[in-house]
């Protein structure tokens, strides 16, 4: 059964490593050393719920509800455009230290709300967990399925805590004005690129619904 664990771990790692909204948010919180371990835990727990739902049968709900998929997609587009705009606005600020200080003033609950939006309004999360993992893990018998899910969940926990701790460790180098400007530009551009990609997918979904 251990082979199913490592299959799940490898697939989970492959899906979570690319830079996306979740990773960017965890990295920034790590650099700020602001509730970064709490955010890593909440991201990993969110993945645990989504992965379990996808592998143990929840994928059918998404696949059979095109309007739900469309709603999640356009909600994700709106959020990513807003999130990217905020990052670019901070990067282009004439007083980057003041802009960064304003971000640091955000309370715990606002940070948690942003994390939940970053996770649950990202349609790619549902495609990864419900479609990819659901189609692969759903074919397995119950015992191998459990090991496969455990491997995928382990990759998520290891990655988010590793990213948060690494970012916090590198914080003295990454907190400089130049580094912060580069990071915010990178995050903003990536968020907008993902948003435009999702918008194209959303248009295709809407076209399919009305034809």
Swiss-Prot record:
It is found in: Cell inner membrane. It comes from the Bacteria. GO terms for molecular function: L-arginine transmembrane transporter activity. Its main location: membrane. Signal peptide: none annotated. The chain crosses the membrane at residues 1-21, 37-57, 68-88, 111-131, 147-167, 179-199. It catalyses: L-arginine(in) = L-arginine(out). GO terms for cellular component: plasma membrane. It is a multi-pass membrane protein. Keywords: Amino-acid transport, Cell inner membrane, Cell membrane, Membrane, Transmembrane, Transmembrane helix, Transport. Belongs to the LysE/ArgO transporter (TC 2.A.75) family. HAMAP family: ArgO. Involved in the export of arginine. Important to control the intracellular level of arginine and the correct balance between arginine and lysine. This is Arginine exporter protein ArgO. It comes from Salmonella newport (strain SL254). The lineage of its organism: Bacteria, Pseudomonadati, Pseudomonadota, Gammaproteobacteria, Enterobacterales.
């Amino acid at each position: 059964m251990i082979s199913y664990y490592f299959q799940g771990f490898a697939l989970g790692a492959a899906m979570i490593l690319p830079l996306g909204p979740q990773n960017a948010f965890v990295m920034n919180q790590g650099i700020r050393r602001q509730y970064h371990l709490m955010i890593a835990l909440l991201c990993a727990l969110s993945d645990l719920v989504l992965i379990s739902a996808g592998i143990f049968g929840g994928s059918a709900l998404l696949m059979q509800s095109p309007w739900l998929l469309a709603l999640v997609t356009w909600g994700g587009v709106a959020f990513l455009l807003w999130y990217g705009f905020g990052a670019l606005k901070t990067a282009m600020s004439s007083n980057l230290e003041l802009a960064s200080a304003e971000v640091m003033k955000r309370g715990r609950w606002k940070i948690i709300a942003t994390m939940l939006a970053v996770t649950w309004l990202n349609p790619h999360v549902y495609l990864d967990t419900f479609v990819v993992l659901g189609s692969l893990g759903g074919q397995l018998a119950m015992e191998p399925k459990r090991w496969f899910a455990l491997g995928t969940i382990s990759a998520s926990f290891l990655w988010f805590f590793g990213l948060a701790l690494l970012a916090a460790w590198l914080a003295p180098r990454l907190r400089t004005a130049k580094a912060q400007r580069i990071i915010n530009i990178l995050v903003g551009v990536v968020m907008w690129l993902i948003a435009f990609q999702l918008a194209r997918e959303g248009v295709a979904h809407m076209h399919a619904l009305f034809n």
